[in-house]
Amino acid sequence: DPEKFATMVVKQSGSGAGGDLEPTFIECRAEGLRVYEGAKVSFELKTSQISKDAKFQNLIKKVAREAPYRTWVSSQGTPMDARYVKRDGLFITLKDKNGKEIKVQTTQLSRASQQIARKYEDARKAKRPDPSARYVIFLIRGKGTSAWSQASRVCAQQGCKYGQLPLDGEGEIDLSLFSGS
């Protein structure tokens, strides 16, 4: 009886990623996949349909395409979807999805967005790849390895970054700690 299982709270680790993650969670179960949008279930998919399902394929393509983008927040709390281009003195250049370049003073960004900009600068100074905010995190149930294997193959084929987290048990999943991250 699933109601008797404890709720599993998924939280960010101390990996240094901080609150700048914008993951797409996909639960891998014996029956197939359960795809989350935010903290809520968006759709479910049987294992046999994973490699053929257009909705799933399009989701993975979208996550791969948007990997360089993230939600930047102004000091007034206004969100903006853009990718980091460069820093020039006190100004940061961002580019939105329409290709428009936006120059903002670092002081016009929230502290969290300023910290994210520093991560880009540090990565570039060290000649490492830019940090990605958008990727898939597979939440793998004990009997969900077949679904995970097929879904991760789709990610690899589409060039979508992904990670995995094994789940110990069958309880409900709580993703609320990622809301608004």
Residue ranges and their predicted role:
Residues 19-23, 30, 67, 77-79, ...:
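Extracytoplasmic
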Residues 23-29, 34-37, 83, 93-95, ...:
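Soluble periplasmic/extracytoplasmic beta-strand elements of cell-envelope proteins
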Residues 61-124:
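Compositionally biased alpha-helical segments
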Residues 53, 57-61, 110, 114-117, ...:
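Extracytoplasmic/secreted envelope proteins and their assembly/folding machinery
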Residues 43-66, 81, 115, 122-134:
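Periplasmic peptidoglycan-binding/anchoring modules of Gram-negative envelope and division proteins
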Residues 32-35, 142-147, 170:
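Short acidic, S/G/P-rich loop/turn micro-motifs used as interaction or catalytic elements
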Residues 1-44:
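Extracytoplasmic juxtamembrane/flexible linker immediately downstream
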Residues 139, 156-172:
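A non-catalytic structural micro-motif
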